[in-house]
């Protein structure tokens, strides 16, 4: 198939750098954020005021990291750099100054791809969206149905201040949700006189009631107000004027305790039309008075006062890596400050040096805690390049300082008009996180204040001006202007064609003539996220299915031989490039050397640049990361050119699946309810074969009885089982292993108690110690098999850091090729997913007029009710493209080129395909898009013509191999004694209450009894049953289930006198073993069967 691609829709398809969100934020942290924090803590003085310690933040240094990225991954280390900062210790009494560079901790560094390497694993810090600090005005209904208004001043950190009105037109204030205080009490406590307040208000008469109320309470002076304030905020403590003053000062006017942040100051200035400089981060009298004034205007409904919508993106901001890290550094420095103050007090003043005062531990711990266990620091989703890219662009409302799943209502999760071009309205998880985790839209960027902006072209007098850079607007700014969507039709000179244009203005839709349009969106794609923008004909899909399509593309497994989609949207190249999976040339030059491991480019100055390629490495999700060169020796290359394909890439484009021939028709019920019928060709030609790499690890520990040993000498193991082990007892690379094979031989010393009596006897007689060790080798688990691709040995001698108590760690990587099989999940890009129900020989599949058998048969009933018609357009466009031997790029939302454009385009392509290929059956105008198929089994044509074409189908990561599981006996839960659940725990299948009802309805009493007792949690019964089976005896009667005893104990613990009685009224002691003849064996005893055992029957 030739690789010519036809671009159908011409619009702005260039995208900004898609990982910029992460990189820019971390750069800000290194340039400004860290310095800000260090300087805000400087100087630290001791309690007597004799010593001062200054951090000179602007002079901090980062050392070169100890390991590079690859080395850090290999050694399970953190890719981090040591931070040093210059400290100056000033002795106020003697005037002595000591300056010294001090180590303050390790800072993990971001890799070029926007990720962090923590303990050898790649992690991503997800962006968090939180309520912006500032002032918010809301209305509430009281219980009498009267509307009251309130104003909240929310800082970045510190106490909340809330003003509210009541039914008597009095103004109250609450500090941090405590009891209500008359607002004028706060004004007086702040030292404002009645006139100071009244002069600042536009409607002072409303406020006078609050002054009268304060006077009635006998609070007429500043001192009385301070006492009253102290009483309300600290009830139960003896009030004092100085205490009140200090309380007020520290709560709102101390920069250490109260911080609006740059954003908060900006928002307050904007809302209240103030001009306070943004260096003033605490509350001012002006802020408080303006807030009161605005609230009174709201109450009286004058002065253009408006309420705030907290779900508007102008009131929510994004905290990216840099800021989250800065907050964490602040926590660490707070702890450090306490330690420094204590050391200053305790130590000898004269001999103290900065290095003795500064202990790096608190800061190291705070940063480690953030990267290791914060909700926002996540194990990177590396299933394929798209999953990786989407993870870095994710925006979560959860996490510290954010919402919780249970508390989040419908309004927060819902799509808001201000999301346009900022957050994707489609891509979000299904389930409890829906709407709380979003994805950044394709063209969106985060500005310096943390608000999301999106680009527009300016429109002047009905002409779109596309020269120069587009203009980025935040959600606030956008509300004030009239914005037309990105798919308005324009002439070549940029003039808008239509007479009336639908525009968005103040979150509403109206139609205006072109002259009144202020801006037009950059591209139709800017509304949606990266994953969604890869879906062709998206506009024909229902949003719920497009959501599934977006999410399932992220779960596509990289295949052995990826293939680009026949029908794409034009964004595939950039997704592959920005994901960081494909190596890109850094210079203009010529390729001088290429092999599977490295590509060398010679630049114009004669310097060599070597690009090392990843070969068969394991990803976080056990998929395979592999890069294949696509340039040849002697090729000229330019800056930014793709040199090699990564996993799930082909020709520098993202290629998540395969283009396969699909027919929509029922086939013998095998595609009922979303099942798929597939051809054997997908298996034999390795179309959907993928490589998975599993990691197995074992450590040799130091035990009380001596060290464990990694060795070839394993007791009671036949020599043939050791065939693939080397002299150390470790499997050789390249060996093929199956379930139960030994990967690493290990023996553990056995204690005295572990020995059976006969061995103790031999020991007593011969006095010689047989080598008492037991086999503790690492074996291949149940359903796995594959080829060993790598073995890594870590020891202390080599300088590796090992877990405490371990002498040696061995890791074995096993790769397996998985062909597609029944039970695997597949999906298209439109949310059309299914499970393979049968693999049919290709001679039995329905075939085309030229004898080509189809690859997959889908159920046509999956389309109408789900309303994802995009799949049908893709099918037919793919059919035309394959017959024209080309690939097609169609940007979504193509009606800017005319009404019903998709249908026209597809029809044009199909007629063209029929003409050029010389096969008139390719397109039949009588049955457009349908062909007459014949049944592969009989050769007879089917009754009706069938829709056939090429579609891009993915194999998803939910593979049946990882799910299939069986158990005979296995571990039991400690309390209930029932089998555990899940494959990882070797668990059983849950027999829930509905299954019990089914068996009850059937009357299967004995089956039910043994399911609830012997096969579950009747401890004695199950051991006796197993013994009976082994000895061939009849199975004894079941006893009491353990969970019944637990229930009895629980009821007794509530103080209920509850017991079980026989029919004769005798109490049964459940805790006593039913069969007193012998104690229950902990495991079945396989005694040799004597003659007596047979005679009894």
UniProtKB/Swiss-Prot annotation:
The protein's enzyme class? transferase
Respond yes or no to whether keyword Hydrolase is given for this record. Answer: no
Superkingdom of origin organism: Bacteria
InterPro entries associated with the record: DNA-dir_RNA_pol_bsu_ext_1_sf, DNA-dir_RNA_pol_bsu_external_1, DNA-dir_RNA_pol_su2, DNA-dir_RNAP_su2_dom, DNA-dir_RNAP_su2_hyb_sf, RNA_pol_bsu_bac, RNA_pol_bsu_CS, RNA_pol_bsu_protrusion
Q: How does it assemble?
A: In cyanobacteria the RNAP catalytic core is composed of 2 alpha, 1 beta, 1 beta', 1 gamma and 1 omega subunit. When a sigma factor is associated with the core the holoenzyme is formed, which can initiate transcription.
Report the function annotation for this chain. DNA-dependent RNA polymerase catalyzes the transcription of DNA into RNA using the four ribonucleoside triphosphates as substrates.
What protein name applies here? DNA-directed RNA polymerase subunit beta
Q: Which organism's genome codes for this protein?
A: Synechococcus sp. (strain CC9902)
Q: What is the lineage of its organism?
A: Bacteria, Bacillati, Cyanobacteriota, Cyanophyceae, Synechococcales
